[in-house]
Swiss-Prot record:
NDH-1 shuttles electrons from an unknown electron donor, via FMN and iron-sulfur (Fe-S) centers, to quinones in the respiratory and/or the photosynthetic chain. The immediate electron acceptor for the enzyme in this species is believed to be plastoquinone. Couples the redox reaction to proton translocation, and thus conserves the redox energy in a proton gradient. GO terms for molecular function: NADH dehydrogenase activity; oxidoreductase activity, acting on NAD(P)H, quinone or similar compound as acceptor; quinone binding. HAMAP family: NDH1_NuoH. NDH-1 is composed of at least 11 different subunits. This is NAD(P)H-quinone oxidoreductase subunit 1.
Amino acid sequence: MNPGIDLEQRFVETLMELGLTPGVAKTIWLPIPMLLMIIGATVGVLVSVWLERKISAAAQQRIGPEYIGPLGILAPVADGIKLVFKEDIVPANTDPWLFTLGPILVVIPVFFSYLIVPFGQNILITDLGIGIFFWIALSSIAPIGLLMAGYSSNNKYSLLGGLRAAAQSISYEIPLALAVLAVVMMSNSLSTIDIVNQQSGYGILGWNVIRQPIGFMLFWIAALAECERLPFDLPEAEEELVAGYQTEYAGMKFALFYLGSYVNLVLSSILVAVLYFGGWDLPIPATMIADWINVDPNNAIFELVTAGLGLVMTLLKAYFFLFLAILLRWTVPRVRIDQLLDFGWKFLLPVGLVNLLLTAGLKLAFPFAFGG
């Protein structure tokens, strides 16, 4: 396994060369990963909302946001400010506690999932040994919040939306977990850092998408369903359910659903990049690049530059899949609820089980290529 670039160590060494003590250098490093996560999640939501509007406008031969900032880039900020100052209305005959708790239970687990997401080598809040299991466990909390929101709203459309959301989330959670288990089986670890390191060192040929094409498609389809993106947006189908479980929500409570949806979409895009496309790993191995430019691969400056490029690579891969998710909204029709459940239980689940067994067999037969 390629140990990768220890960005923390290189950062501390660079500061020590400038005259700082090891303690001060480590103290300076400590808040940087957390700040990057907060900034990354916030900027990711703003950029994804702006991209969705621009790409949607282009698909419909419109201009989209234009006047609020350059190219309308401040339109998502204006939307956020508007929602903050909107009146928070709680309809009569609702359960106020469940009505308030619903959106909170949907949003908080998504933000906690960012704890284990690496944007680059050692650029994450914590490298949990059970990182993937932690993320799957957190993602299973959201259906409870969706059911609460639908049930407590005292509205038939909200209730139907909540039931659809819970059924959809439960149906596609299992194929998603099976796809991830195949990756975990190859990397022999539940840590996202170990999964990326297992793919590094061979460039694009080492990425899991080469060895797990079925698992990748399975994960991507299930992730779209978990994010309630077209063609799987049945819980909030405007033509059928007004806005689904969000129908009775306004102000900041509605904003929490809106925020959670896009944060989850960005999270899923990053996880696709991390699990199947090498995360921060470059398409060409760093050692090969060092040979081309005649530089020592262990040079501190070269490793810092490579780590910076790795951060850019992670974001580029993630935003490519974000672009695909937005494009799918305008290119595929919505499925019916019976088609959605049949597809999840009768197709994706068996395919996930077969893929897991196939991975186990290939690992035994070719341990050098499948992480034996």
